[in-house]
Curated annotation (Swiss-Prot):
InterPro entries, sorted: MFS, MFS_trans_sf
Residue list for modification Phosphoserine: S500, S501
Transmembrane feature ranges: 55-75, 98-118, 121-141, 155-175, 187-207, 219-239, 286-306, 325-345, 353-373, 379-399, 414-436, 448-468
Annotated membrane topology: Multi-pass membrane protein
Protein name: High affinity cysteine transporter
MF term (GO), any: cysteine transmembrane transporter activity
Induction statement: Induced under nitrogen starvation conditions, co-regulated by GCN4 and GLN3. Regulated by the MET4-based sulfur regulatory network. Expression is maximum in nonrepressing sulfur conditions and considerably repressed in the presence of organic sulfur. Induced by chromate.
Organism: Saccharomyces cerevisiae (strain ATCC 204508 / S288c)
UniProt keyword Phosphoprotein present: yes
C-alpha cells in the first residue's frame, strides 16, 4: 500500500515512518479512559436511548438555562428604556446606541484572552467565576445615575459575557455526538430567542407596581440579577469541566459519553495545551475568515431586537405595556420557528447552509415590508418588525455551531470561535450606530443596510462555505480507507514530559481512535466535514 503523507503540527515528532505525539498534547480524557475503558462493555441500543435522554435532561437543560439568563441580562437595557431608565440617567436615543456599542467593544476585546483562559482553566470553575462577576455587575447597574456609569458597567458586562456562549457550545460538543449537536442547536438557542417571553412578563408585572419606593427599572434589574445569582451558585456546585468528571453520571456512563463523541467527531474532547501550530492553521484556513465575514455582515442587524420597544413606541398607539406584550408574542413566534428548524436538521442531513438561508427569508421579507409599507399601516409595519427582528437568530445559531463543528483540533476550534465572535462583536459595535436619531421614525438607512448586507450577502457566504467543504469531503472520501489505515499505522502516542525527546518516552498505541491525538481537520484527512 502506498503511504499518503501525514502532516502533523510542529508539536509532534517525526521519526522515520512514525509520528509520535507527546501525551501532554493528547485529549484530557485519555487518563480516565486508560483507567476505565477496558472494564466498560459496549453500550446497547436501549442503554444508549436512556443515556441520550439523561444527557438532554441534565446537560442540555443546564446550558440552555444559562443561555436563557444570559440573554435576559442582555435585554435588561432594552426593557429598562421603557421603565424610566432614560429619565433617571439622562440617556437619549444616540447615547443609548453608544451604550450598546460599548457593550460589544468589551465583548470583542474579551474574545481571544477569554478563549485562551477557557482552554487553560477548568471550564466549569471558569464559567462559575464569570457568572459571579456578571451577577455583581447586574446588581451594580442599579447604582448608575449618568451616562458614564452606564457605559462603564455595560463595557465590563460585555467583557465578562464574551466567552460564555463559546463555553456553552464547547460543553455541548463534549457531551453530544455530531448529529445530536447539530439538531439540538436551534432548540438550545430557542432559549435566547425566547428570552423576551419571561423577560417581557416580568417587565409587564413591574409596570403594574404602583407608588414604588425605587424606580421601576431598578426593581426589574434586581429581579434579573437575583435569578442570575441563583444560577451562579448552581454552576459553581455542579457544572462539569468535561465528561470525565461530571458528578451526576456514573463511570460507565462517562465512558460511553466519551466513546460516542470521539467516534462521531473524530476529534478530541478537551485539550489544555494551547497549540501554536493549530492557532496558525486556523488563521491561515480561509474557512475561518469566511465564517468571520458571515458574522460581520449578519450581525449588523443584531441591534434590531434591542430597538424594537423604541420602534413600537415611536410608531404611536403602542404604549410601554403594549410593547412588552408585542415582544412576548414575537419571541413566541421565534421559539416555534426554532423548534421547526430543529426538526428539519434532525430529519435531513447536510443542510446547514440551506436551512440558514431558508430562515433568513422571513427577516428579508419583513425588513423590505417594514421599510416599504405606508407609515399609516401601523399593524402591518409592527408585524413585519416582529418578523424581521426575531427569526434571523436561527441562521446565526446554525452558523455558530457549524463554524465550530467544521474544525477539528481543540485550539483550532477555539481560535475559529474567537474569530467568529470577534467579528460579531465588531458588527455589534457598528450596528447601533446605523440607527440614527435623525432618521427616525422610519430609519430607512438602517433597513437598507440590513436588507443588503445581513439578509442577502451573508447567507450567500454560507452557501459558498457549503460548496468548499463539500469539495473537500469528495476528495477525502475517494481515499478514506487508505488514509485511515495510514494514520493508524504511523501515529502513536509517547508518554513523555519532554516533547523533544523520543528516547525517554514510552510509546502507547491507541488503535482505531485518532480522536485522542487532537489532530486538526487539515492534518487528519479522514475528518469528514459536517455540512
Amino acid at each position: 500500500m502506498s503511504k499518503v503523507d501525514v502532516k502533523i503540527g510542529a508539536d509532534s515528532i517525526s521519526s522515520s515512518d512514525e509520528i509520535l505525539v507527546p501525551s501532554r498534547l493528547a485529549d484530557v480524557t485519555l487518563a480516565f479512559m486508560e483507567e476505565n475503558d477496558a472494564a466498560v462493555p459496549e453500550i446497547t441500543p436501549e442503554q444508549e436511548k436512556k443515556l441520550k435522554r439523561k444527557l438532554f435532561l441534565t446537560i442540555f437543560t443546564f446550558v440552555s438555562a444559562i443561555n436563557l439568563l444570559l440573554y435576559m441580562d442582555k435585554a435588561t437595557l432594552s426593557y429598562d428604556s421603557i421603565l424610566g431608565f432614560f429619565e433617571d440617567t439622562g440617556l437619549t436615543q444616540n447615547t443609548y446606541n453608544t451604550v450598546n456599542t460599548l457593550f460589544y467593544v468589551g465583548f470583542a476585546i474579551g474574545q481571544f484572552p477569554g478563549q485562551y483562559l477557557a482552554q487553560k482553566l477548568p471550564l466549569g470553575k471558569f464559567l462559575g467565576g464569570l457568572l459571579a462577576t456578571w451577577t455583581i455587575l447586574i446588581f451594580l447597574s442599579c447604582t448608575a445615575y449618568n451616562f458614564s456609569g452606564v457605559v462603564a458597567l455595560r463595557f465590563f458586562l460585555g467583557l465578562t459575557e464574551s466567552v460564555v456562549i463559546p463555553i456553552l457550545i464547547t460543553t455541548m460538543g463534549m457531551f453530544f455526538d455530531a448529529s445530536e449537536r447539530a439538531a439540538a442547536q436551534p432548540f438550545f438557542f430557542a432559549a435566547c430567542m425566547g428570552s423576551p417571553i419571561p423577560t417581557g412578563f416580568i417587565a409587564y408585572g413591574v409596570l403594574h407596581i404602583t407608588n414604588p419606593s425605587i424606580s421601576l427599572w431598578k426593581i426589574f434589574t434586581i429581579i434579573i440579577g437575583g435569578l442570575t445569582f441563583i444560577m451562579t451558585v448552581v454552576v459553581i456546585l455542579w457544572f462539569p469541566n468535561n465528561p470525565a468528571d461530571v458528578k451526576f453520571f456514573s463511570i460507565q456512563e462517562r465512558v460511553w459519553i466519551i466513546r460516542r463523541v470521539q467516534a462521531s467527531t473524530g476529534s478530541s474532547i478537551e485539550q489544555k495545551v494551547f497549540k501554536k501550530s493549530q492557532f496558525r492553521e486556523a488563521m491561515k484556513d480561509y474557512i475561518t475568515w469566511l465564517f468571520g465575514l458571515f458574522f460581520l455582515l449578519q450581525q449588523l442587524a443584531n441591534n434590531l431586537p434591542y430597538q424594537q420597544n423604541l420602534l413600537f413606541e415611536g410608531m404611536g398607539g403602542v404604549d410601554a405595556l403594549g410593547s412588552t406584550l408585542v415582544s412576548v408574542a414575537g419571541a413566541g413566534f421565534a421559539v416555534v420557528c426554532a423548534f421547526i428548524a430543529t426538526l428539519m436538521l434532525a430529519k435531513w442531513k447536510n443542510i446547514s447552509a440551506l436551512t440558514a438561508i431558508f430562515w433568513t427569508l422571513p427577516a428579508l421579507v419583513g425588513s423590505i415590508a417594514a421599510a416599504a409599507l405606508p407609515w399609516d399601516n401601523k399593524i402591518g409595519i409592527l408585524a413585519n418588525i416582529c418578523m424581521a427582528g426575531q427569526i434571523f437568530g436561527i441562521p446565526f445559531i446554525i452558523a455558530l455551531s457549524w463554524a465550530s463543528s467544521s474544525a477539528s483540533g481543540y485550539t483550532k476550534k477555539l481560535t475559529r470561535s474567537s474569530v467568529s465572535l470577534f467579528a460579531m462583536g465588531i458588527a455589534n459595535i457598528i450596528s447601533p450606530q446605523i440607527w440614527r436619531e435623525k432618521d427616525s421614525p422610519r430609519f430607512l438607512p438602517a433597513w437598507i443596510v440590513q436588507i443588503v448586507l445581513s439578509f442577502s450577502l451573508a447567507p450567500a457566504i454560507l452557501l459558498l462555505i457549503h460548496f468548499i467543504l463539500k469539495r473537500r469531503n469528495n476528495q477525502r472520501l475517494k481515499n478514506y480507507d487508505e488514509n485511515l489505515q495510514n494514520y493508524l499505522d504511523r501515529i502513536q502516542l509517547i508518554e513523555s514530559e519532554n516533547p523533544s525527546s523520543i528516547e525517554e518516552g514510552k510509546v502507547v498505541t491507541h488503535e482505531n481512535n485518532l480522536a485522542v491525538f487532537d489532530l486538526t481537520d487539515l492534518e487528519n484527512e479522514t475528518f469528514i466535514y459536517p455540512l
